[in-house]
């Protein structure tokens, strides 16, 4: 967040539709206004002097809380945050919250607190954030501002998620769900946008916990909400988690679709998650053994040479060419870039198995008998790993043959292989005859 983002992304000089009581003919106090702007002029170059000057604004109020005191406190919160004076910042924030009942309009206070929350949320200090959100929620119990309560609770829930404190997160989720229910205890579909925010938070929790049963049910529910106009960032989160769920279940095409949708949503919202999701899209593309390059799409093409993506781009090329040496070289050279992501790391072994299988099939094709150590040398793995790979291929009928463990030889069943090809050709021929018959019947 830039220091130039004045007043937590909200300009103090804007009116915010401030309303003054009809039975009051008084204008805003000129002395207060002048003191406020004199203080504001100091904040960039002399922040400590600005704090003392803003305190004079509060002193001039003489206990009568109003617009200029509220604005002065906002500036004091911001300056203390920049100076890392967190204790003093909290004192000033609690002081500001006493103004929201009567000193400023509901609309003004909501916008201001929203912008303060967004600004403070950039902090990495988890304890500070928790204190900030909980203080806000305490103040809102009396204010009865449902929208601000909801936003603050979702931020607190996200904080608990980032800290992996799922017990506290579940309590927050329960409260959020209750706020979006009808009198019958069902989800109020009229609150679709808020429901999607809750689902997004809950879906992230179940994804990390690898609770696919609950994740699947919630994911399907989220896609059936039609009454919402969700922020693309929320839909990006939901589709990304859906992609992870499908990939773990081996549904690679569904995962590919979800990751692509997540990437587009993140791209639209300007989220840095778009590059991570593009990596997942590439991963799904390779696992589904697609010959189509994922970077051929209009949306993904601009990122093809992105430094963060380049390693995955090269990985796709070597994978599609069944170049196992190049594939392993890229993995070694870009280990920190590729393997740092836990989700990608989970599935790299599957990719290696796929590419080794393709190279293996091509390697053994001319032979009737082939030595396992020879295969191990070609695949650059140990003979024991070759045996494991061969067993899998034989069991799923990718390879027809048997392993002679004593002599360390793979014996291929060429008769069965020929028979399979003959059966496939016969099936193809029968299908052509059926098609020809259908065409003749139609013409007749």
Swiss-Prot record:
Q: What does this protein do?
A: Component of the COP9 signalosome complex (CSN), a complex involved in various cellular and developmental processes. The CSN complex is an essential regulator of the ubiquitin (Ubl) conjugation pathway by mediating the deneddylation of the cullin subunits of the SCF-type E3 ligase complexes, leading to decrease the Ubl ligase activity of SCF. The CSN complex plays an essential role in oogenesis and embryogenesis and is required for proper photoreceptor R cell differentiation and promote lamina glial cell migration or axon targeting.
| Lineage of producing organism | Eukaryota, Metazoa, Ecdysozoa, Arthropoda, Hexapoda
GO biological process terms, alphabetically, are: eclosion; female germ-line stem cell population maintenance; germ cell development; germarium-derived cystoblast division; male germ-line cyst encapsulation; negative regulation of DNA-templated transcription; protein deneddylation; protein stabilization
Indicate the quaternary assembly: Component of the CSN complex, probably composed of CSN1b, alien/CSN2, CSN3, CSN4, CSN5, CSN6, CSN7 and CSN8. Interacts with Rpn6.
Cite the record's tissue specificity text: Expressed during embryonic stages 11-14 in the muscle attachment sites (apodemes); pharynx attachment to the roof of the mouth and in the epidermis of the head for the dorsal and ventral prothoracic pharyngeal muscle attachment. From stage 16 onwards expression is seen in all thoracic and abdominal apodemes.
What protein name applies here?
COP9 signalosome complex subunit 2
**UniProt keyword annotation of Transferase present:** no
Start and end residues of each PCI domain: 255-417
Keyword Ion transport (UniProt): no
- Write down the Gene3D superfamilies for this protein, in alphabetical order: 1.25.40.570
Single GO cellular component term: cytoplasm
Per its UniProt record, what InterPro entries does this chain match?
26S_Proteasome/COP9_Components, PCI_dom, WH_DNA-bd_sf
